[in-house]
Design a protein with these regions (language model features):
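Cytochrome P450 core scaffold surrounding the K-helix E-X-X-R motif
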Residues: 11-17, 223-236
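Short, well-ordered junction/capping motifs at the entry into regular secondary structure
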Residues: 121-126, 170-216, 268-271
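Active-site microenvironments of metalloenzymes and redox enzymes
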Residues: 25-166, 173, 228-229
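Structural recognition of the beta-strand scaffold that forms the well-ordered cores
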Residues: 2-3, 30-35, 78-81, 132-134, ...
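GGW-centered surface loops in extracellular recognition modules
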Residues: 1-5, 10, 128-131
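Proline-centered structural pivot motif
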Residues: 50-57, 176-178, 227, 238, ...
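Short, polar loop/linker segments at the starts of domains and inter-domain junctions
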Residues: 11-28, 54, 186-205, 260-274
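Disulfide-stabilized, aromatic/cysteine-rich ligand-recognition loop
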Residues: 200, 206-208, 241-287
Length: 287
């Protein structure tokens, strides 16, 4: 886990968590250096008796995921095809293993008979010290390096800027992340490859200023928040609305979208029961 010092952010962007007219105060928190890997997910979930967490998703399947890139370990690729409900359930399981207080209260669980939690009643208590999903604001703050006084804060990607930032195809992404025009070799081409390796082992690209890897590209990351319009004004540790239709995802992916979608200010959203092979997550903790 990487320690992140909170602070005050006076927004000046047109999109993202720190828009013009929004003043955010964030408390200190920590965030995982890497996305949750298949190996970690399997170890935490394999003996679960309450919900079938389909740990077999963590086993290599070339037909489903494509060939592993030479030199990479499948166990160190990010776990994927996890719903938002699966992610919060994992956080509680890991908290219990580490003897921390679970952050989430989860009840009324319903699952797909094959593998995934598709419905549950979930609430969070941020006074608890266990693992959790980062809020959207925490995620963006960490992705931008956690320091508004340095140039990294204004980079388009997490840990890198580019003269072509905002373009569909951008070799400036090659240093820090995987997207659909470099997903086969790690080097941007002018076309989307006809075959791809899928996700890649975590930590192979350059980290950002905080030492956090793969926050631009790779796979989209679930955040806690329901999708909502970001409002102006002053706010302390925002967590978004209490209800909604879709949960926020951040970061971009190897498959969905161009380099533009890997920017640290951009968001995707999806129904919390959705699970697909370019959705995953990383974990956070309050301090």
């Amino acid at each position: 886990m990487i320690s992140v010092n909170g602070g005050d952010v006076y927004g000046h962007d047109t999109i993202g968590a720190f828009i013009e007219g929004r003043n955010v105060t964030l408390s200190d928190f920590s965030i995982s250096k890497y996305l949750v890997t298949r190996d970690l997910y399997f170890k935490v979930m394999y003996d679960d008796k309450d919900v079938n967490a389909w740990p077999s998703r963590c086993e290599y399947n070339q037909t489903y995921r494509g060939e592993i890139m030479e030199g990479e370990k499948d166990s160190l690729r990010p776990v994927e095809s996890v719903s938002w409900f699966d992610a919060v359930y994992f956080c509680n399981r890991l908290s219990k293993i580490k003897e921390y207080e679970p952050v989430y209260s989860i009840s009324d669980i319903k699952r797909n008979t094959v593998y995934s939690i598709i419905s549950a009643t979930v609430s969070q208590d941020l006074t608890k010290n266990g693992y959790r999903l980062p809020t959207e604001t925490e995620w963006e703050y960490a992705a931008r390096g956690g320091d508004v006084t340095v140039e990294d804060w204004n980079f388009y990607y997490s840990g890198a800027d580019s003269e072509n930032a905002g373009a569909a195809i951008d070799s400036g992404m090659d240093a820090v992340g995987w997207y659909n025009c470099n997903a086969e070799t790690g080097v941007t081409t002018r076309r989307i490859p006809s075959t791809m390796h899928g996700s890649h082992q975590v930590g192979l690209k350059k980290p950002n200023r905080l030492g956090v890897y793969d926050m631009s590209g790779g796979i989209f990351e679930w955040c806690w928040d329901w999708e909502h319009a970001i409002s102006t004004g002053s706010t302390l540790d925002p967590v978004g609305p209490d209800s909604g239709g879709k949960k926020v995802l951040r970061g971009g992916s190897w498959l969905h979208g161009w380099a533009i979608y890997c920017g640290v200010r951009l968001r995707l959203s999806s129904e919390p029961q959705t699970s697909t092979d370019y959705y995953g997550f990383r974990i956070a903790r309050s301090k």
